[in-house]
Design a protein with these regions (language model features):
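Conserved catalytic core of the tyrosine transesterase superfamily
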Residues: 1-238
Length: 238
């Protein structure tokens, strides 16, 4: 089909030039290499070793978290009860941004003291614990805002926008004078980290976060401040 490897747009050398000459994301690079591997190895039967073309594994980064003092400060400066309820719900339930905006009133079970997160990441439902403090806060919020279907709704009805939630957090961080970079997902990271700090079994944390693979949850077993304080210097044993 091709006269030579140099003319072959699927040759490893051509592929390398394409990857270096364009801004190809890691996922796109994986798909491209997999397709070329299939062509050479599966169709042409050449059995070329192309694994070196896969993107390097990203560096491990410990997720950023807010301290419990940070969380308390945020909630204390929230004068708008809706904003306070939004941030408290994310942190208390370890929610992703989309899970928060998709929460419906029917998902809150004050009898069983549970919150059902429907169709989370990977289209998997899960159930988390409903905090007693959160329930009291939500009841006060209900009295004032009277949502009809979604737990948090926009001014014209329908679910609250993700952008609005992000703006709430940004304004709250500034008001609480917390000079840390953080996003809505940082609240979820904080929830997981604080659970582990208080001794919650990693398997329970995995279930509460909705992680399919325990390896994803294990990133939260990094050395937390609480763990560091328990470590004794060998000098103290002399």
């Amino acid at each position: 089909m091709f006269r030579s490897g140099a003319d072959d747009p699927l040759s490893p050398s051509c592929l390398l030039r394409r990857l270096s000459g364009r801004r190809v994301g890691a996922d796109g690079q994986k798909q491209l290499v997999a397709a070329v591997k299939f062509w050479y190895n599966g169709v042409l039967g050449k059995n070329l070793q192309l694994d070196y073309l896969y993107p390097d594994r990203p560096e491990f980064k410990i997720p950023k978290v807010f301290s419990q003092q940070d969380i308390k400060a945020m909630l204390n400066v929230c004068e708008n009860i809706k904003h306070k309820a939004i941030l408290a719900t994310i942190y208390s339930c370890g929610l992703r941004l989309s899970e928060l905006t998709n929460l419906m009133i029917k998902d809150i079970d004050s009898t069983q003291m549970t919150v059902t997160i429907r169709q989370g990441k990977g289209n998997r439902d899960r159930v988390v614990v409903l905090s007693e403090k959160l329930l009291l806060l939500l009841r006060d919020y209900f009295v004032e805002y009277k949502p009809k279907e979604y737990l948090f709704e926009g001014q014209s009805g329908g679910k609250y926008s993700e952008r609005s939630v992000q703006q709430v957090l940004k304004q709250t961080l500034a008001k609480a004078k917390i000079n840390k970079e953080g996003s809505v997902h940082t609240l979820r990271h904080s929830y997981a980290t604080h659970l582990i700090e208080q001794g919650t079994d990693i398997r329970f944390v995995q279930e509460l976060l909705g992680h399919k693979n325990i390896k994803t949850t294990l990133i939260y077993t990094h050395l937390t401040d609480a763990t560091k304080r328990k470590i004794k210097s060998p000098l103290d044993n002399l």
